[in-house]
């Protein structure tokens, strides 16, 4: 019996040692002694910590076998207050007390934004509603164009691309009274200078000679490389309109580009982005019935002719004495058809002649540096985008040099210059007789769009440069095929744009007294 009691005593002794736990406890208050509920208290370098309760107290239970008997650093933090740390000797068992008294962080409480003039100010001192957009979120969006990268980044900001072409313009609207009843866009400010972001459409029903029918222009905001942007502020309110007049009635988008690093020596960064685009789903098209109507082959607009599978097969019967068409490269001749025998269909071939896998690549290189008296940033961005429609593309090269010089304790000079060269071609897609998809979708399944341009010969007379389409399979003496061959739309009715643009902002800041700045800006 005595031996059993000894064993139980020894077992209880070791069990008590095993269950012994160390803890750190205490309170977190402000400088007036008021408790701070929800403050975080963490053992630095670990995930061990606790939050204060309603009375400002906390207790951290130290896991067994971790830091017992060691000196650790305890860190406490609370929104709007300066963080504080202290060294604590953790006992092997039992608890130790550590109290914290935090000071208000006056700087941290000030929400800084950029006003419509490009100056930094506290949000609560502005007469306008503002939203901030993180520049990192914009570049991570994967969008090729700066305007499109603003989508879903700020409340009440509506971003609508005008088309799917590479480099196509984008409409930006800030929700409000003006955007409900109108279509005006906000004013765009880049480094304190207003720029244009217009959206322009070409003519609507242009078939032969026009170069902008149904195609959209570029947006000037997309001349900016998103990787050069430091911050974006969206402003709406009376103060925005007061500064810029009626141009800011629909709000202001304020863009600030990056400055050079003031410390740490020269820094170089390189970034490459690459993506591919494909048509998500094709429009199903029938390949049972040939061109014509009432069960007979013909050159009418409809595709309710004879049943293709019931044809005899082989070559069509033609009349070589009648008008004919010769392709521009001389490899194809089409005579007047008198009897349709061929069972060939071209739905897939015609589709593939219009669409492709799009590709986007962007290379960005930046060099920045400086010291206490000067900073600099140089960047080069190279964007190349081929659209899902063949021959559509958008190429852009960006060069930027931003410098800042502190001439004295009171005078600072800042210069920001960005040069852009962009080149693009966008395809006509409007709902008109020259529209790309109208021509493609209306093409009969038994007509090959490949040979779209050539010479029409009739009665010994040659008509060169004729447009061949499914309703004018010989081209004809007229230049009007009624509905375009979609390959003609791609190859012959280009909407090309070449832009050279320089955006500059030069600023001198003079601070004669503390809290007073005199700014001279030109650009």
Cite the ranges covered by each PLM segment:
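Residues embedded in well-ordered regular secondary structure
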Residues: 132, 153, 165-170, 180-186, ...
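Periplasmic N-terminal soluble interaction domains immediately after the signal peptide in Gram-negative
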Residues: 47-48, 53-111, 245-247, 257-259
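Short, polar/charged loop or turn motifs at beta-strand boundaries
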Residues: 28-31, 129-152, 160-164, 172-179, ...
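N-terminal periplasmic "start-of-domain" segments of outer-membrane beta-barrel proteins
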Residues: 48-57, 113-141, 167-171, 199-215, ...
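Cleavable N-terminal targeting peptides that direct proteins into the secretory/outer-membrane pathway or into
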Residues: 1-23, 68, 82-84
């Amino acid at each position: 019996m005595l031996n059993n009691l000894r064993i139980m005593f020894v077992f209880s002794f070791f069990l008590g040692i095993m269950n012994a736990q160390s803890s750190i406890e205490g309170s977190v208050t402000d400088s007036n002694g008021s408790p701070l509920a929800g403050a975080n208290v963490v053992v630095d370098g670990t995930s061990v910590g606790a939050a204060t309760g309603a009375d400002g107290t906390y207790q951290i239970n130290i896991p067994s076998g971790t830091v017992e008997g060691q000196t650790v650093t305890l860190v406490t933090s609370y929104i709007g207050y300066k963080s504080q740390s202290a060294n604590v000797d953790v006992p092997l068992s039992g608890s130790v007390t550590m109290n914290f008294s935090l000071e208000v962080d006056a700087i941290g409480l000030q929400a800084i934004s950029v006003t419509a003039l490009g100056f930094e100010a506290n949000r609560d001192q502005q007469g306008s509603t503002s939203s901030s957009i993180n520049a990192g979120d914009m570049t991570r969006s994967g969008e090729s164009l700066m305007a499109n990268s603003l989508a879903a980044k700020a409340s009440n900001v509506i971003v609508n691309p005008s088309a799917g072409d590479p480099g196509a313009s984008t409409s930006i609207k800030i929700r409000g009274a003006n955007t409900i009843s109108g279509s005006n866009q906000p004013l765009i400010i880049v480094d304190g200078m207003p720029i244009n972001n217009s959206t322009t459409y070409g003519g609507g029903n242009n078939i032969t000679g026009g170069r902008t029918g149904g195609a959209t222009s570029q947006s000037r905001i997309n001349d900016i490389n998103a990787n050069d942007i430091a911050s974006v502020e969206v402003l709406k309110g009376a103060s925005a309109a007061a500064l810029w007049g009626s141009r800011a009635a629909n709000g202001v988008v304020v863009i600030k580009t990056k400055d050079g690093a003031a410390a740490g020596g020269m820094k170089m960064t390189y970034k490459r982005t690459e993506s591919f685009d494909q048509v998500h789903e094709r429009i199903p098209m029938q390949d049972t019935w040939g061109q014509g109507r009432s069960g007979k082959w013909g050159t009418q607009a409809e595709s309710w002719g004879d049943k293709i599978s019931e044809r005899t097969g082989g070559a069509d019967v033609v009349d070589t004495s009648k008008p004919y068409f010769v392709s521009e490269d001389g490899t194809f001749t089409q005579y007047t058809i008198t009897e349709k025998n061929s069972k060939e269909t071209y739905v897939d071939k015609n589709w593939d002649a219009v669409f492709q896998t799009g590709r986007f690549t962007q290379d960005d290189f930046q060099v920045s540096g400086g010291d206490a008296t000067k900073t600099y940033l140089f960047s080069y961005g190279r964007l190349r985008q081929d659209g899902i429609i063949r021959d559509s593309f958008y190429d852009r090269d960006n060069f930027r040099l931003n410098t800042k010089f502190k001439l004295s304790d009171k005078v600072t000079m800042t210069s920001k210059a960005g040069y852009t060269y962009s080149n693009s071609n966008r395809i006509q897609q409007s709902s008109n007789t020259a529209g790309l998809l109208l021509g493609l979708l209306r093409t009969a399944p038994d007509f090959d769009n490949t040979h779209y341009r050539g010479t029409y010969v009739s009665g010994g007379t040659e008509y060169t440069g004729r447009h061949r389409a499914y309703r004018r399979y010989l081209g004809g003496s007229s230049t009007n095929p009624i509905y375009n061959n979609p390959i003609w739309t791609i190859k012959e009715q280009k909407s090309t744009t070449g832009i050279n643009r320089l955006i500059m902002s030069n600023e001198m800041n003079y601070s004669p007294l503390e809290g007073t700045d005199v700014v001279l800006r030109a650009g």
